[in-house]
Structures are given as C-alpha cells and as structure tokens.
Amino acid sequence: MAAKKISKKEIIHYYDSTEVDYKLIWDLNKSYAMHFGYWDKKVKNFPQSLQRENEILAEKVKIKNSDIVLDAGCGVGGSAIFLAKKFGCKVIGITLSKRQADKATNNAKQKGVAHLAEFRVMDFEKMTFPDKAFDVIWAIESICHADSKKRFIEEAYRILRKGGRLVIADAFLTKENVTADEEIILNKFLFGWGVNYLETVKNFNKYLRTTGFRTITFTDVTNNVMPSSKRLYRFSIPAMYIGKFAEFFKMRTKTQNGNIIAAHYQHKALVRGLGKYGIFYAEKSSAIS
C-alpha cells in the first residue's frame, strides 16, 4: 500500500475541525477521550469503555505514583488526567495542536490535577526532552500519525530511563500487499482520519527490537474494540448523506466529511481483516550503560 503524504498541518486541521464530531457522538465533553474504547465484562456502556481502555493500559504498563509519564499524542488530556487522578503521578502530554493543548490544560484545571498534568505543543518524532527523562511513554491511537514509526520508537528509547516502559494502543496492518479493492477501503479509512499509513505488527515489532527494546509483547484486542467500531459504522450511514448535503451548503467541510467516511470504512477494514487493533508493550533494559 502506497503511503500518502499528509502534512503535520493537515493532521492539526483534522483534529481541530472535527472536534465537533467527537463532542456529538464520542462523549468528548465528559470523557476527554478520542480513542476507540475497550469492551470487556466490566463495561456496561460506551463511556465506560473509554475509561476502561485507560485502565487496561495502566495495568499493562504498571503505572506507579513515582512515575514520570509522557502521553505522546495527548488529545484534550483524557488519559493524562486519568493517570494523574488515579495514581498521583506526574504526566506531560504533547500534541501537535495548540487548540488541544490549551483545552487539555483547562480540563486538567477543572479536574484539579493541573499540578500533576501539563501539556505542550510538540512533535513526538522530534521531541525536545533531554535523554532519559521519563519512566513511561504512553500512546493511544496517535503513533499511527507518525511519518516514520521507526523514528518515533528511536525517540521513545532515547527519552526513556533505564527500565522504562512503553505502551502503545493502535491499529496495525495485517499484511503489506493488498488488492486494489482493499487499498480503496484502507485509503478511505486512513486518509479521512489524517493517517499516512499503518505499519504491520511484524515491522513494528522489528523496529522495537532493533532499537534496543526488550520484553516486547503484542496483544490483539480487536474484538474488544469491535463494539465501538460498529457504533461508529452505524452513525456513519445516515451521517454520510447528511454530510454531503451540509457540505453542499457549506455547513460542513471536506475534512469533516472525510471523518465520517473514515468512520464508515474503518469497520469494513476490520471486518475484512485488513487491520487489527492491538497493544504493544516494551521495556528499555535496566542493564544498559
């Protein structure tokens, strides 16, 4: 699948202009979350699934009160605020969007954790943090936007301390070579959400290993996000028709309608097995010099 070059400015524009959609159907004003969510026996409704994904990742990476955590691609602060409130740890969230960073800062103030959670505008492929600055790097559905997944992994390794932990929840390709029909589905899914390309699990694992990470695990949780995927798909069916009408009368933009189209085709991609949703965990050795 050929990668399309989507600029950082286009990614910022996507998130800033589609915030209204996340507010309408994704509980953004209450959850501060923009991720799929995680469904298991503990989850009874959609808002709970959003919170549950934070809990699952926190368990996976074993967050402690003493940790300094980087939320790479923090959105409006949902995960960082969750970690600060639940564990009392220090969290720095970074995002390309100043609008998101400002909203995240305000959200942290409203939740009483501004002393623990701070937010900055920064590109996670070119971070300005010093070496060995963090105990944990956390990324939910953000590394998909990286121009180079390998470059992010190298940066993550650089800024992690000895024994530091990395946890990533995201979508991954199941194969590198796709048919023309499959490529159409993937393009509508990815480009509508401001994503250049997805990496395969095999390649992502290789980048982690060759960079120096150890104790690498990947957990396929596609079934746990499928209820949210179906929810998006159901919303997208009427929304695509309404969106075309609204765009004709300049009530919605092409980017906003691309968001709806992506919501439709993400489910088709998962159902056809073109992609999977999973959680990577890796550690930086505590024995390195």
Stretches with model-predicted labels:
Residues E125-V136:
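A short acidic, Gly/Pro-enriched loop at the edge of an enzyme's catalytic core
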Residues N196-G212:
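Short alpha-helix
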Residues M240, K254-S289:
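C-terminal lobe and adjacent flexible extensions of AdoMet/dcAdoMet transferase-like proteins
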Residues Y32-D40, K44-N65:
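Conserved alpha-helix/loop element of class I SAM-dependent methyltransferases that forms part
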